[in-house]
């Protein structure tokens, strides 16, 4: 789909159609294939990938709308939910056909009290039809006002380790910097899920094995109990580009779970 005039129009359409309980309209806010990656690993419900699976890819709008119809809104309504309010998004990185937006939402009851709040990194891409959300990197453990300095430091440390293994071309140790399955979001329409380290080696081992000087700047975007989103501007050799990461703590280890790059 991805038929919106601007990235922010697609972002707001996401919430408007969710609140209307319009499965087709909600699916129309996305670009495809679409992926939702969560820092939290919930139990699988047995009905295929859902918005909160660790890494669920939806090939088409029909696939996403079918998931939404199947899952329904009853589970939200049972908590007292009547609407979800998106926060004003902030542009993190942008090119002519891809944008990283720092956004999020709060679910409200009828009396306007808050049920839960989240922070999400939205990856928007411009397809032939227009803009849509290609990927969502969810913190899924966000608490307003909580001190997350330790989580931010751990996530930045995980990124630093990634860089210190990449610079000398140390592929074996570089491969250990990721949680698998690893989600990669490239050019518009390019979403891949790498199942394990050997698949990552086959796909990117030659690229990572080239020793090149690296300089970069990185900042945290949002942090939760077990997940942090980061932004990075990097120069590697002659190439300069921007990246956003979802870094997650799983089994006590902070590693990269998802990456989106903008050249």
Name these PLM-found stretches.
Residues 1-32, 36, 130-176, 180:
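Short, low-complexity N-terminal intrinsically disordered segments enriched in polar/charged residues
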Residues 23-97, 172-219:
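A solvent-exposed, acidic/Ser-Thr-rich amphipathic alpha-helical stretch
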Residues 81-82, 95-97, 113-116, 210-212, ...:
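A generic structural micro-feature
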Residues 86-92, 104-107, 119-125, 216-221, ...:
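Hydrophobic/aromatic beta-strand elements that line small-molecule binding cavities or substrate pockets
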Residues 97, 110, 145-158, 226, ...:
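Extended, well-structured beta-strand/loop surface patches
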Residues 102-109, 204, 229-237:
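Short beta-strand segments that buttress and anchor functional surface loops
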Residues 114-148, 240-263:
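Short beta-strand edge/turn micro-motifs at domain boundaries
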């Amino acid at each position: 789909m991805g038929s919106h005039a601007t990235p922010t129009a697609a972002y707001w359409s996401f919430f408007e159609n969710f609140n209307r309980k319009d499965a087709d309209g909600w699916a129309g806010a996305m670009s495809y294939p679409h992926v939702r990656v969560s820092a939290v690993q919930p139990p699988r419900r047995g009905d295929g990938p859902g918005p909160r699976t660790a890494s669920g890819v939806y090939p088409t709008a029909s696939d996403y709308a079918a998931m939404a119809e199947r899952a329904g809104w009853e589970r939200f309504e049972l908590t007292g939910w009547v609407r979800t309010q998106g926060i004003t998004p902030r542009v993190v990185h942008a090119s002519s056909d891809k944008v990283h937006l720092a956004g999020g939402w709060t679910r409200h009851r009828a009396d306007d009290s808050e049920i839960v709040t989240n922070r999400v990194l939205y990856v928007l891409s411009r397809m032939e039809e227009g803009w849509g959300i290609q990927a969502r990197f969810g913190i899924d453990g966000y608490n307003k006002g909580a001190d997350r300095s330790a989580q931010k430091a751990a996530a930045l440390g995980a990124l630093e380790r990634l860089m210190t293994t990449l610079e000398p071309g140390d592929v074996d140790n570089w491969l250990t910097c990721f949680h698998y399955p690893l989600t990669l979001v490239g050019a518009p329409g390019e979403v891949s899920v790498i199942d394990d380290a050997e698949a990552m080696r086959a796909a990117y081992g030659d690229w990572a094995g080239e020793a090149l000087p690296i300089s970069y700047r990185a900042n945290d975007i949002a942090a939760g109990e077990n997940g942090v989103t980061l932004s990075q501007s990097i120069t590697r050799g002659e190439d300069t580009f921007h990246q956003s990461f979802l870094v997650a703590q799983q089994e006590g280890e902070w590693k990269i779970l998802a990456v989106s790059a903008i050249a």
